[in-house]
Amino acid sequence: MIVIATASAVAFMVYSCKGKLGEAESLNINEVPVQTVDDMFIVQTENGKIQMRAEAPLMERYERDTLSYELFPDGFFVYGYTEEEKLETEIIADKARHLKYKDGRECWEAFGNVVVKNLIKQEVMETDTLYWDQKNEKIYTHCYVRMYSPDGFMQGYGMESDQRARNSIIFNPFNSYGI
């Protein structure tokens, strides 16, 4: 009787697990984040003074053969400070991505309702996509840009500025006006 019960239990386990083994084999590790962070909060300082703060509701890190990257699918917020630790710049986007290539190159991309504010100059810039060249300390886009300031309104295609949005230049302006 014990032998029949044991044989039945073994047969049941082998039969019930048989169809599920293929599911584990089909999992592609490149499509699954290796790290997930909820309510991410980063502060960058130099000599004890805050330079930058970044926040995101969710960060997902992925690893590939040629690069690793972090995705921020639920929004990304960056705050830049002056040397006197006064809040100067805000960058807000629906989504962002930070690419790190194995050869050492890096690229930050913000996309979807990107808003860049320089609070000191009272300038607001809106675009769909923004890139940050961290090595050269520049932000830029090739997309349509609107910029509001106390001096007027500008719009055009393509923009470049230092990373604090202090010196924004719109490359192909049109229908702009000054006050």
Indicate where each model-derived feature is located.
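Mature-chain termini and adjacent capping regions
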Residues: 1-179
